[in-house]
């Protein structure tokens, strides 16, 4: 996995107020001359989630309404309302 792409995708999803679709992520990266396929984006998101789970993070990236966003894992959702 390309760490630069991983960090960019993670940052985009984290900073977004709304879910981001694979196309939106691809378009943003493409506008910076960093083309990436939909499959690569989805693989990176899967690997990010694997790392979050392995590290015991309280959050993950979920697919919602055709896009991706950060969410608190259900066992911690009670604490954040």
Language-model regions: role of each:
Residues 2-19, 45:
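Positively charged, polyanion-binding regions of nucleic-acid-associated proteins
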Residues 5, 43-77:
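Charged low-complexity interaction tracts in eukaryotic proteins
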Residues 12-15, 32, 51:
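Conserved, well-folded catalytic cores of nucleic-acid-processing
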Residues 24-28:
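A short acidic, leucine-rich amphipathic alpha-helix
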């Amino acid at each position: 996995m390309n760490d630069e792409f991983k960090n960019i995708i993670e940052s985009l999803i984290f900073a977004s107020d709304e879910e981001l679709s694979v196309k939106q992520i691809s378009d943003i990266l493409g506008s910076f001359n960093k083309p990436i396929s939909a499959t690569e984006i989805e693989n990176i998101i899967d690997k990010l989630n694997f790392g979050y789970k392995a590290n015991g993070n309280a959050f993950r990236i979920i697919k919602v309404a055709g896009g991706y966003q950060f969410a608190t894992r259900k066992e911690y959702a009670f604490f954040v309302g």
